[in-house]
Structures are given as structure tokens and as C-alpha cells.
Design a protein with these regions (language model features):
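Glycine-rich beta-alpha loop elements in corrinoid/cobalamin-binding modules
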Residues: 35, 42-43, 49-190, 400
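C-terminal accessory regions of radical SAM enzymes
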Residues: 4, 9-26, 173, 370-524
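Low-complexity, glycine/alanine/valine/leucine- and proline-rich hydrophobic stretches
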Residues: 595-648
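Radical SAM [4Fe-4S] cluster-binding motif and immediate context
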Residues: 31, 195-365, 370-377
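Long, charge-rich, low-complexity alpha-helical segments
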Residues: 503-576, 631-695
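Structural recognition of alpha->loop->beta junctions
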Residues: 134-151, 312-317, 374-392
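A glycine-rich beta-turn/hairpin centered on an aromatic-Pro dipeptide
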Residues: 551-613
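N-terminal [4Fe-4S]-dependent radical SAM core
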Residues: 1-2, 9-24, 169, 175-215
Length: 695
């Protein structure tokens, strides 16, 4: 039997078409579909040679097609599967997730149309929980494989090959023989020993060598029971980990085969078993090999000692699901975190330079404005830590979760759906009709009732915080600290924006907040309204808004600034070890900008990090050098008086001899250091900081 396994499409989940296209290379290079590659390896162990299709790669082929405006992605995918590469395929198995389930079903219909005699089968978390209703609603789906499929899939393929009855195969849902009834067999047993599973068939993924963060399954199952989460149901709350020896062997194999040593270790709750985490870290350290990795954890299942060990063993990223900043809501949703401890865990990760995703949600049925303020406060408070990346989504009632079950009869379809089910810019009317007709299948595209909050307010607050964090991180934190709560600032901003006629073009709120017009408008609001009318620390706020304005300007001018005759490219061939001669002519590097702000920037940042007072910041004009690099975030340096003078002279394109002469004329004195020596040393420091270079 010829088998084709197909990944769930995720590349359509962008805020806009433009974003989707620019993210293409990154997504293609980083997201190997490890789930279907693991199943492919199981089939290979049984002597089969499965095909693997990554629908994200098909999606990007469609983006590059000159005729894409004449055909939808679904039609393009249908034509792709109708091609000769799939002639003779007997079994098409689709992995599914909630966000792209409508699209997957429509592509499956195209496959069935092209291959009517082939079995079209669904698996994965979404199909597993809506198996019966899916088979009833969509006749082109033949079977659903529920839950973990490593045991079920080979048995199913064998039975279909031999024409045997499916009645004894655990973990499948299918149509009865001739009577149209749905048969749901008992659950398949969970995989008890994950070490016994074969190594995923990464050789079937053409872009595997381009993965920057290689996915490897670390374990399965979460023993907790949060009311909004579907993970515990899919894995039946059975927590399992691969052994440290097995994980180390897998990581070595990837490094030897593909030359990749950075890993995304896939597990929803790695740190539940502290002893096993310690064993894993110690095994990595004892190996003497340099691997970097990231995983997920609960903040109450780590402490600073464990975080330090994880960092030493190569951990560079942790996903923390905080969910809500409200103590009251922590209890209601059965998350049960102590939020002060959660903040400490984020701080500890920052201390050891571990990047943290701080995941938060809003839109719970019992959530009040006070609860929302607490969540927004936790979001912005996380910005104190350079290595923290807070996230904010709106609750999606996932099928089969306690929240969805409780509110299934009162769900409301929204045009602007929950983040976990973002449909993508190219959603077609067929998807909308499908979702509207079957709320029990597509519940994650609906919203739960919120008697205490307005949904439009919540959605705009989300966009404001997410886009504000990206555009003016320190100013957002400063406004939160100055006002007492960022939601108060947001409400003032809303009123000011409306009063000044700043309406969303075509009603597209998300597009407005994603564009450069938003920070420009917001900076005007801060200068013209917030600082004179509401700020307790006007000097600090003025310094921050001037800093963010300059920084934003460099972000959007970085591509053009290299054309400035007074600057040289940051990728210049200038030799950092070369000697300067008196005739060497110096210029600013590309992307370097010098600004003056009215207060000590370093002191403001220190107080923001430590939650110190901002109202007594003294007036002290300082110069900042902002250096934008092509591949990363801006570097900001507060200049000493000596560096500021020298950088100003370099802006004029003078030679070293001319700069030294001007330096002496200005009678700049450095105690205990001859002026000429101080000048040359200062020039070399600026050069090492990559602020200046030889012209």
C-alpha cells in the first residue's frame, strides 16, 4: 500500500498577506513537521515507503506562483495532489489542528475528488476530539485515527491492505459497513516507552538542513487540568519523558547527520519531574558537547537553582504558560500559579540569559475589568526583563475542553476570531459557511460569552499591547509604571484617538496597529496629552518618548541610510585590527544616529527594571548613540562627554589628525591623561564599538 502523510497547514496564520510572504523563508526553514515524520518512521520500520507532504511548503509554492490570484490555495493544493507524484497512493493521512481545520477538510475533499478509491484519513488533536461529528458532516472523510497513532496506524494500513475488518483496531472512528452508522472503537493504549519509538524520518523532509531550531520530541502528556486546555485530554494526562540517554543519542544523531546543534525539545510540561530534568542536564554537561535547546515549563515546576543548571546545560529558551495575571482567575481556570513566584522565575531566566515566552490570555467568561487590568499589568511588567517576550491572546474555546463543554450552547461566532484559531488573510467563503454550519466542530472559531467585558475593547487592547511592545517597549513600561496601570493609559489613548479623528481605515483595527502610523500617532498622544495632563514624571516620560521616536526612525530608515555619503556600511571591509594613521578619514557607520534626551537614560532604565520612582529623575541632557544592525535589534549607548565630542567630529568626515587638532582647540581635559592620547584612545573605543569606521 502506498501511504502519503500530510502535515497540518500553519503558514496561513499571519496578520496579513504581506507578513505571510515575508515570513516564508523562516517558516520553511524552522518548522519540520515532527509529528508526521515520527509516524513515517513507524511505517518505514514496517517495510513501507511513505511519502510526506508539508502543506506549508505547498503554500509557499502557491505564493510564488504567478497565477495565484486566479486560484485559491485550496484549488492549488488540489491540483498538486492530483499530479502524477501521487498516482497510485492508496492512503492519504492528514494531521489536523484547530486553526486550519476548515482548510484541511477542503483540501481533503480535493484529494478525494482526485483519488476517489483512496482512503482519506484524519488524525491529530483536532480530528481526535470531533471525530464523530466530522464523519457525519463531511462524507469524503473515511476514517479518523484518535490520539497517539504509533500503534494504530500500522494496524490500520495492514487491515486496509488485506481488506480485513476494522472492528478490532483500537483508536479509530469509521463508517459502518453499508448502514452509514459511525463506529467508534475503544481507545488505543498510550505508548508506554517513548525510547522504543524509531527516530523520526527527517530524511523525508527536504528542508531539514535549513532548520535553525531542530524539533525533537522530549516527552508527552501533562498531569494538570486547566479548563481551557486540550493537551491533557489528547494524552490522557499521562506524563512521560524519554530517557536522558535517548535524548542525547538523538541530539548527537542530528548533529552528525545534519550539522545542527540547536533544538526545540517538544513537550508541554518538561519540568514536572525535577529529577529527570536534572539527569538530562547532567548528561548533557558530562557529554562535553555544546547543544542549545528550548522547551516548555510551568513556573511552579522550576526554581532559580534548576534554571541555572538548565542554562549551564545549554537551555536558551523556555515557554511559560502563565495564562492570567489575576489571582482570582488563576483559581477559576484551575491553573493555580502563585504569580509572585511566576515573576521571580521570569527574572531568574533573564538573569541567566534564557529567553522566555510569557504566554497570557484574556476573554474568560468570568473575567472582570479588574482581572483584565491585572493581566495587562503582568504583560507589561515582564518588559522589565530584556529576555522576556510576553504574549497575549484571546481565549479560544477548544473542542472538548471544560470551557467549551460548559458554554457550547452560548458560543458566538466572531468575524475577528480568537488568536489560537486565526484563519489567515486568505480565508474563503466556503470556510466561513463551514464554520457557521458546524459550531460543534469548529468551536475554537467562536467566542464564549463575556458579561463583564466588551469584546471590541479587549481586542483593541490586545493589539495595542502587542504592537506597542514591538514599537516602543521601554516607553510602554514607563507609562505603566508612571500611571499605575497600562489599561488607564490605553483608555486615555482610545479617547484621544477618537477625539482627533484617528479612525481605522476600512474598520481594520489590526492593520492600523501593525503600521508605523500607530507609534507616530501614539507619540503625539504622549507629548500633547499624557505628559501635560496625566504624567507624574514628565521629564522621564519626555526622555523615553524622544528615545523611542529616534529608535523607531532608525528602524524604518535602516535600509536607506547606507546611501548617506556621511556614513559607511556596517558590513564595511574596515579591519577592526588595523592601525589608524594621522591621514585616516573617519565617518559614522551605517545605521548610527546620535540624539540628545533631557535626562539620564541609564538611570531611567535602572529604575524601570527595579520599579524605582520616576518622578524625581533630574534634568541632565545626555547623548545616546543608537546603532541599528541589519540582523538584530538596535544597540543603544549613553555617550560620555568625550565620546560625544569625538562622535560629533567624526560626523564631519575629518581625518584623525584634524580630529586631534580640533580636540586640542576645544580644551577637553581628561584628568591624568594627555589630551592627544585621550583623543586617540577615545577614537579607538568608538571604532571597537562599531560606531565609526574608516571612510
Amino acid at each position: 500500500m502506498k501511504v502519503c502523510l500530510i502535515s497540518a497547514p500553519t503558514a496561513n496564520q499571519f496578520d496579513s498577506r504581506a507578513v505571510g510572504e515575508t515570513e516564508a523563508a523562516r517558516i520553511m526553514g524552522e518548522l519540520a513537521p515532527v509529528g508526521i515524520l515520527s509516524l513515517a518512521a513507524v511505517l518505514e520500520a514496517k517495510g513501507l515507503q511513505p511519502q510526506v507532504v508539508d502543506l506549508n511548503r505547498v503554500y509557499y509554492s502557491w505564493l510564488q506562483d504567478s497565477n495565484r490570484d486566479k486560484a485559491s490555495f485550496c484549488s492549488f493544493a488540489g491540483a498538486y495532489f492530483a499530479g502524477r507524484d501521487f498516482a497510485g497512493v492508496d492512503f492519504f493521512g492528514f494531521s489536523t489542528v484547530c486553526s486550519s481545520y476548515p482548510l484541511t477538510l477542503r483540501i481533503a475533499a480535493e484529494v478525494k475528488r482526485a483519488h476517489p478509491e483512496s482512503a482519506v484519513v484524519l488524525g491529530g488533536p483536532q480530528a481526535s476530539v470531533v471525530d464523530i461529528s466530522t464523519l457525519r458532516a463531511f462524507p469524503w472523510i473515511d476514517l479518523v485515527v484518535r490520539g497517539e497513532a504509533e500503534q494504530t496506524l500500522p494496524e490500520l494500513v495492514d487491515a486496509l491492505t488485506a481488506g480485513r475488518s476494522l472492528a478490532e483496531i483500537p483508536g479509530i472512528t469509521f463508517r459502518g459497513n453499508g448502514d452509514g452508522g459511525i463506529v467508534r472503537n475503544p481507545e488505543a493504549p498510550l505508548v508506554a516507552d517513548l525510547d522504543a519509538l524509531p527516530f523520526p524520518a527527517f530524511h523525508l523532509f527536504p528542508d531539514v538542513r535549513f532548520c535553525r531550531h531542530f524539533p525533537l520530541e522530549l516527552g508527552r502528556g501533562c498531569p494538570f487540568s486547566c479548563t481551557f486546555c486540550s493537551t491533557n485530554d489528547f494524552f490522557r494526562r499521562r506524563f512521560r519523558l524519554k530517557s536522558p540517554a535517548q535524548m542525547l543519542a538523538d541530539m548527537r544523531r542530528v548533529k552528525q547527520t545534519y550539522g545542527i546543534s540547536s533544538f526545540e525539545l517538544v513537550h508541554d510540561m518538561f519540568t514536572v519531574d525535577r529529577k529527570r530534568v536534572v539527569e538530562f542536564c547532567e548528561a548533557l554537561l558530562q557529554s562535553g558537547e555544546e547543544f542549545t535547546w528550548g522547551s516548555s515549563a510551568r513556573t511552579d515546576c522550576v526554581d532559580e537553582e534548576l534554571i541555572a543548571l538548565m542554562a549551564k546545560a545549554g537551555c536558551r529558551g523556555i515557554f511559560f504558560g502563565i495564562e492570567t495575571g489575576s489571582r482570582r482567575m488563576q483559581k477559576i481556570i484551575d491553573k493555580g500559579l502563585e504569580l509572585n513566584d511566576s515573576t521571580e522565575r521570569v527574572r531568574s531566566c533573564d538573569k541567566f540569559k534564557i529567553n522566555t515566552a510569557v504566554s497570557l490570555m484574556a476573554g474568560f467568561p468570568d473575567e472582570t475589568m479588574d482581572d483584565l487590568r491585572d493581566t495587562a499589568a503582568f504583560f507589561v511588567d515582564s518588559l522589565r526583563y530584556d529576555h522576556a517576550d510576553p504574549q497575549l491572546s484571546i481565549l479560544a474555546p477548544l473542542a472538548g475542553t471544560p470551557i467549551q463543554t460548559q458554554y457550547k450552547d452560548s458560543l458566538v461566532l466572531n468575524d475577528d476570531v480568537a488568536d489560537m484559531s486565526y484563519r489567515g488573510w486568505q480565508q474563503e467563503p466556503q470556510d466561513h459557511a463551514m464554520i457557521t454550519a458546524h459550531p460543534e466542530i469548529f468551536s475554537s472559531f467562536y467566542a464564549v460569552p463575556m458579561p463583564y467585558l466588551e469584546r471590541e475593547f479587549l481586542k483593541e487592547l490586545r493589539d495595542f499591547l502587542l504592537c506597542g511592545m514591538r514599537a516602543f517597549r521601554k516607553l510602554l513600561l514607563g507609562l505603566h509604571q508612571d500611571s499605575g496601570n497600562v489599561v488607564h493609559v490605553f483608555q486615555q489613548w482610545q479617547e484621544w484617538r477618537t477625539r482627533n479623528g484617528l479612525h481605522f481605515s476600512n474598520g481594520d483595527r489590526t492593520a492600523y496597529y501593525a503600521q508605523t502610523s500607530f507609534p507616530a500617532d501614539f507619540f503625539r498622544f504622549v507629548r500633547l496629552h499624557y505628559i501635560p495632563a496625566a504624567s507624574k514624571a514628565p521629564l522621564a516620560m519626555t526622555a523615553l518618548v524622544e528615545y523611542e521616536t529616534a529608535l523607531l526612525g532608525r528602524d524604518h530608515e535602516s535600509d536607506a541610510v547606507g546611501d548617506n555619503p556621511g556614513q559607511v556600511s556596517d558590513s564595511s571591509s574596515d579591519d577592526m585590527e588595523g592601525l589608524l594613521s594621522p591621514d585616516s578619514r573617519l565617518q559614522l557607520r551605517r545605521g548610527v544616529n546620535v540624539i540628545t534626551i533631557p535626562a539620564d537614560y541609564q538611570e531611567i532604565v535602572r529604575r524601570l527594571r527595579q520599579r524605582g520612582p520616576l518622578h524625581d529623575i533630574a534634568e541632565k541632557p545626555v547623548k545616546l548613540a543608537i546603532r541599528r544592525t541589519p540582523a538584530g535589534p538596535a544597540e543603544v549607548r549613553q555617550l560620555t562627554p568625550l565620546s560625544a565630542e569625538l562622535l560629533g567630529l567624526c560626523e564631519e568626515g575629518l581625518t584623525v589628525q584634524e580630529i586631534t587638532g580640533e580636540f586640542l582647540l576645544r580644551n577637553i581635559e581628561i584628568p591624568g591623561v594627555p589630551p592627544e592620547k585621550a583623543c586617540l584612545a577615545g577614537i579607538e573605543i568608538l571604532r571597537q564599538q562599531r560606531l565609526i569606521a574608516l571612510a
